[in-house]
Amino acid sequence: MAFNDDNFMLKNEAAKRLYQQIKDQPIFDYHCHLDPKEIFEDKVYDNIVDLWLGGDHYKWRLMRANGISEEEITGSASKLDKFKAFARTLQRSYGNPVYHWSVMELKNVFGVCELLTEDNAEEIYHRINAYLVEHQISPRKLIADSRVRFIGTTDHPLDDLAWHKRLTADDTFETVVAPTFRPDEAFIEHQRFADFVARLAQATGRTITDFKSFIAAMEERIAYFAENGCKASDISFTEIVFEAAEPEQLDRLMTRVLEGYQPQPLEIKQWQTAVFAELCRLYKHYGFVTQVHFGALRNNHSAIFNKLGADVGVDSLGDQAALAINMNRLLDHLVQRDSLPKMIWYNLNPSYNITVPNTLANFQANENGIAGYLQFGAGWWFADTKLGMISQMNALAEQGLLANFVGMLTDSRSFLSYQRHDYFRRILSTYLGEWIEEGEVPEDYQVLGSMAKDIAYNNAIQYFS
C-alpha cells in the first residue's frame, strides 16, 4: 500500500469521496499559541530548525526518548546537528503522530517526498534551507498557503494587544488574528499570583483589596479584550473542582495569600470555584466562548523545568477523583447563576472521554437556538492522535451530536501545524466512511458530506460568531 499519497489515511472508497468534499475548505484555527508579533513582522525564515524544531516540545520529547543529548535538542549544538538528531529520531518514530505530521509537513510545504533519515538528513537540510529563501517562506505565506481564515492566539490578561491591533489595521493581511483571554495567574496557587494582582491594579488604575475589587478589575481587562476582537477565553486546570465559599472567606484568603501565605488544597479549590464562576458570568456577558483544558500534570522533571522553563516536554496526563460529581455541580452552579457561557471542554485523559460529553449533555438546554452550546473539544495534546481523535468522536457521537462538533484546532506554536487540520479531515473522512461501508448510516453523500463540511469548518464559524 502506498504511503503518504493522495489517499493517505483514507481507508475506504466512502472516505475518499467524503474527503474530496472537505479537503479544500479553509481553516478556522480557533485556538493556538502562535505569536502575533511574528505574524506581523513576517520575517522570512532561512533555517528549517528555527521553523520546525524550535519550541516544539513534541519533537523534543521524542528525541529524549531516543537518547539524544540535551545539547542537540535545546542546547548549543549546531542547527545541522540538531536536524540530524531529529532525523535519527524520526526514522524510529513509526506509530507516533509526530511521524505523520512531519512527513506531511515535509511533503506538502517543502515538496520533500522522500522519507527523512539519518543518511539523507544533511542533503535535505540544505535543500529546505534553500527552499525557504527562494520561496520567501514567512509566517504570513504559510498562513495564506494553508487557507487560514481565523487564528485565535493565547494571551495574558494584561497584554496591551498592540500586535493584534497592528494586524487588524493591516489591509494587506486577510486572516483575522484575534486574542484569547487566558488568566492562569488569577488563581492563588500560581507562583505569580501576587505579582499579577499588583500589575492588574496598576493596569486598571484600581485599588484591589478584596474579591469584589479583584473581579471588577478583571472585568475591565475582559472588556478591553472584547473591544479588540476577542471571541474566546481559555484556562488550564489540573483538576475540575467545586467547593463553595462565602465572600468573607475569599476576602480573607486573598489578603493572606498576598501577604505570602501558602494556600491549602481546600482553599485552592474554593478560590478556583469562585473565580471561575465569576469569570464565566463575565464571559457570557461579553460573548466569549469559554475553553477549558484540564487534566495536565506539568513540569514533572524538575531539573529540566528549572533549566529550560515550562512547555519543554516534561508534562503528563493526570487523573482525579470525583470528576463527574465536580463537573456536574460546577455546571449546575453556573446555570443557577445564569452564568453558563458557550464552552469547549478539552479532556487530556481519554479515560474520561465518556464522562465529559455525558455530563455536558445535561446542560445543553438554551433559549438561543444554539446547537452544541457546550462542546466536547477535539483530542488534546497527548490525545491529538489518530486513536485519540477517534475515541473523542466516538464518545461525542454516542453521548451527543457529532454533527454539531466544532472540529479541529492546532493548539500549536508552529506555523507548520496547519497540516494537522488535513490530518484530522482525513481521519474524519475515514471515520464517517466506515459508517457507510458497514451499513450503519445511509449511503447519502450529500448528508454525510454536509456533516463533514460542518465539522471541518462551518460549525466553528457559526459557534464563534
UniProtKB/Swiss-Prot annotation:
**GO annotation, biological process:** D-galacturonate catabolic process; D-glucuronate catabolic process
Q: InterPro entries, per this entry?
A: Metal_Hydrolase, Uronate_isomerase
Please state the Enzyme Commission number of this protein.
5.3.1.12
Q: What are the entry keywords? A: Isomerase
Report which residue ranges the record marks as coiled coil.
none
Instruction: From the UniProt record, list the reaction(s) this protein catalyses.
Output: D-glucuronate = D-fructuronate; aldehydo-D-galacturonate = keto-D-tagaturonate
Q: List the GO molecular function terms.
A: glucuronate isomerase activity
Q: Which Gene3D superfamilies match?
A: Metal-dependent hydrolases, uronate isomerase, domain 2, chain A
The domain of life for this entry's organism is Bacteria
- So what family is this one in? Belongs to the metallo-dependent hydrolases superfamily. Uronate isomerase family.
* Listed NCBIfam families: PRK02925.1
Protein name (Swiss-Prot/TrEMBL): Uronate isomerase
Q: From which organism does this entry originate?
A: Streptococcus equi subsp. zooepidemicus (strain MGCS10565)
Q: Its gene?
A: uxaC
